[in-house]
Structure formats: C-alpha cells, structure tokens
Amino acid sequence: MEIQFDEPKKSLRPKKVNKFKGRNKKSETRDKFVGVRQRPSGRYVAEIKDTTQNIRMWLGTFETAEEAARAYDEAATLLRGSKTRTNFVTHVSYDSPLASRIRHLLNNRKKGTKQQDMNGISSTTSHADTTNDTTSDGSTSSTTNCIGTASGAINSTSASGVTSTSTNISTSASGVASTSTDISTNSSNTNVNDKSESLLSSSTTMQKPNLFEDAYRPDMSNLTNEYESSSYKSNVSWDFGPIFDNFPFDQWLDMTNNDGLLCDMVDKGVSEFERMKVERQISASLYAINGVQEYMKNVQDCNEAQWNLSPLC
C-alpha cells in the first residue's frame, strides 16, 4: 500500500510595499535655512541668538524663506563677524535698514546690560558700605565700651582701694580705740576691785574686834559642876575648862537676868538695829550651849572607853 501524505498548501500573503513619505515643505525650509522658522499662518520669521552676550533678537516676519535667511545672515555677520556661519554668501551693507535696526537693538541691549551691571555693582557697594559702617560702628562702640569699662574698672578699683584703705584705717583706729577702752575699763575694774577689797578687809578688820568685844560671857559654873558629877558617874575624864572660858556665858546670864533693862532700853529709844544685833548674839550663844550638850550626849552613848581630849583654843 502506498501512503500518500498530503502536504498543506501554503497561503500566499501579499507583500507589503514600503511607502516612503516625502519631506514636508516646512521641514525642508526649517532644515535648509539657519535662523528661520515658519509660523502656522505660512509666513517666515527670522531671529538670531547670541550666547556670548545672552541676546535673542527677533529680526522680522517675511513672506519667503530666502528673505528671512538673508536677514539672519546680515545680523550674524554684524554680531559675530565675517567668519560666522551663514545661509548665503552675502555682502553686508552697513547702510541697510536691517543693519541700522540691528545696531539700534544691540546698543539698547548693551545699555540695558550696562545699567544692570551698574545697578548690581552699586547695590553690592552699598551693601558692602552698610556692612562696613555697621562693623565700624560696632567696633567703635565696642572699643568705646571697652575703654569705658576699663576706665570704670580702673576708677572702681581705685575707689575700692581708697575705700578699703579708709576702712582699714578706720578699723585700725577703732581697734586702737577699743583696746584703749578695754585697757581703761580693765584698769578701772582693777581699781574698783582693789578699792572693794581694801574696804572689805578694813570692814572685816573693824568688825572682828567689835564682835569679840561685844560678845557676852555668861557664867557656866553650874554647868561645869553638873558635867563633872556626870563624868564621875560615867568614869570618864573630861577637861573643858578652857573651852567655856572662850564663850561669853557671863554676859548672856547678865542679859537674861536683866530683861527689864532691855525693855527700859527699848523704851528709851534704842534703835532697832542694835536690838537685832543683841538678839543675834543671844541666839549665837544659845546655839553654842546646845551644841556642847549634844556633843556630850553623843560621846557618852558611843563607848565606855576613856577619852583624853586636849583643850580647844
């Protein structure tokens, strides 16, 4: 058997024909002439730019592209010289109305740039002057302030030195015065103390003989006899003879026996001070007698031993 393979039929596609678009008139004119552009209305405009002087100048509107290109060539040669790129080989006539207009525009442009430059320079100079003035004013004020503060410090230091010296002098003077017053007060105190001591010593020396002279001496013979009898009973030997001689028992007994005399003395106008003095002396003598009796009782109660006491002077 024969096997037959059917080959698929190839579909024939039509070849694409590349259609090249022709150049547009606008693009042709734009690429053909330098410095020329066409408006939507169909007219042509010529303008020039100068990057060195930052100038963009509108040269005018023309009906054809060639006229606009020639205007550009004249402006370019006037601005940049004869070696610049132009659309045509042209000879520039300096008396043409385009050349005069270009000169007028260039002069105005140069004046404007100069004016701007002058304004910028004046503004910078004025700003610099103001800054200099402010700095100079600040420096002068600071210098004057420094001078003022320095002078003030000198004056204050001098014044403080004067005041300190004056205060030191015053304090030293006050110290001398205080020392002198202390010395005087000490001397006066010592004088007063000496005087008081002398007065006290004289008063004591004057009072001692008066006390001994005015002391009463009562008669203690009965007491001595009773004491001797009691001492014999207790087998204790006592010797108080000289002691009782020192006490003014005789005068005390005389005063006790003479109470009427005391009343008479009071009636006669004896001063109250003397009466108090006499009463004090009587109380002192009674205290001495009571002390002796208590001492004797204590001695008798202590021991039965014999005591040999030396006479008290």
Curated annotation (Swiss-Prot):
Residues 11-24 have a biased composition (Basic residues). GO terms for biological process: nodulation; positive regulation of DNA-templated transcription. Changing residue 61 to I: In ern2-1; reduced colonization of roots by rhizobia, but still able to form nitrogen-fixing nodules with premature senescence of the nodules. GO terms for cellular component: nucleus. The keyword Nucleus applies. GO terms for molecular function: DNA-binding transcription factor activity; sequence-specific DNA binding. Residues 122-143, 157-193 have a biased composition (Low complexity). Expressed in roots, root hairs and leaves. Expressed in root epidermis and root hairs. Induction: Induced by Nod factors in root hairs. The keyword Ligase does not apply. Residues 32-89 bind DNA. Residues 1-29, 108-143, 157-204 are annotated as: Disordered. Residues 1-10 have a biased composition (Basic and acidic residues). It is found in: Nucleus. Transcription factor involved in symbiotic nodule signaling in response to rhizobial Nod factors (NFs). Binds to the GCC box (NF-responsive box) of ENOD11 promoter. Acts as a transcriptional activator of NF-responsive box-containing target gene promoters in root hairs. Involved in early stages of root nodule development. Functions redundantly with ERN1. Is essential with ERN1 for the initiation of root hair infection, and nodule organogenesis and development. Required for accurate expression of the NF signaling genes ENOD11 and ENOD12. Belongs to the AP2/ERF transcription factor family. ERF subfamily. This is Ethylene-responsive transcription factor ERN2. It comes from Medicago truncatula. The gene is ERN2.
